[in-house]
Amino acid sequence: MNTLQLINKNHPLKKNQEPPHLVLAPFSDHDVYLQPEVAKQWERLVRATGLEKDIRLVDGYRTEKEQRRLWEYSLKENGLAYTKQFVALPGCSEHQIGLAIDVGLKKQEDDDLICPHFRDSAAADLFMQQMMNYGFILRYPEDKQEITGISYEPWHFRYVGLPHSQVITAQKWTLEEYHDYLAQTVRQFA
């Protein structure tokens, strides 16, 4: 599992790339699948923070077909500008490899699948304070749309593993910026 794989419109998935193995993840109202290590760290994070009654897993792994359906639905319902801001193109979504999670508050049962509510609460704040200690980063931070190509998504987290999550969070980087940093470091020592 390459937890640092960069996936976006400039770095699409390889043809037919799928996660090798998926497991049912806990703390969801429906069946959500993730790669085993991601599910394990998600569960550890939720239990360690005591948020079992406050947050839920809204989404995880999606097939390319499901991603295409979501893109087309959003396009029809919300238009192109909105869809490009909040929905990755099919073949360019981290959800397709089982390393991305969308998190929502339990009290928001009528949550939007595209933009679940996950901010302005003590539960979201606590999650944000601890996520990096379990390998997660906020994938699309505020004021970084020019870098990521996706608008601020306070509900969307990516598993990158330790210590990467701690470095990325401490530096307030995106995964794209971390990739640039790693490439520059390699060039310095090559």
Swiss-Prot record:
Subcellular locations according to the entry: Cytoplasm
Listed transmembrane segments: none
NAD among keywords: no
Gene Ontology MF terms in the entry: carboxypeptidase activity; metal ion binding
Induction: Expression regulated by upstream promoter elements. Part of the probable VanC-type operon associated with vancomycin resistance.
EC number annotated for this UniProt entry: 3.4.13.22, 3.4.17.-
Active site, renumbered: E153
N-terminal signal peptide: none
Pfam families listed in its UniProt record: VanY (PF02557)
Binding site for Zn(2+): H95, D102, H156
Result of changing D59S: Reduces catalytic efficiency about 5-fold with respect to D-Ala-D-Ala as substrate. Almost no reduction in catalytic efficiency with respect to UDP-MurNAc-L-Ala-D-Glu-L-Lys-D-Ala-D-Ala as substrate
Annotated binding of a dipeptide, by residue: Q67, A88, S93, H95, D102, W155, H156
GO cellular component terms listed in the entry, alphabetical order: cytoplasm
Residue positions binding Cu(2+): H95, D102, H156
Catalytic activity: D-alanyl-D-alanine + H2O = 2 D-alanine; UDP-N-acetyl-alpha-D-muramoyl-L-alanyl-gamma-D-glutamyl-L-lysyl-D-alanyl-D-alanine + H2O = UDP-N-acetyl-alpha-D-muramoyl-L-alanyl-gamma-D-glutamyl-L-lysyl-D-alanine + D-alanine
Keywords per UniProt: Antibiotic resistance, Carboxypeptidase, Cytoplasm, Disulfide bond, Hydrolase, Metal-binding, Multifunctional enzyme, Protease, Zinc
Subunit structure: Homodimer.
Similarity section: Belongs to the peptidase M15D family.
NCBIfam families: vanXY
Name assigned to this protein: Bifunctional D-Ala-D-Ala dipeptidase and D-Ala-D-Ala carboxypeptidase VanXYC
Source organism per UniProt: Enterococcus gallinarum
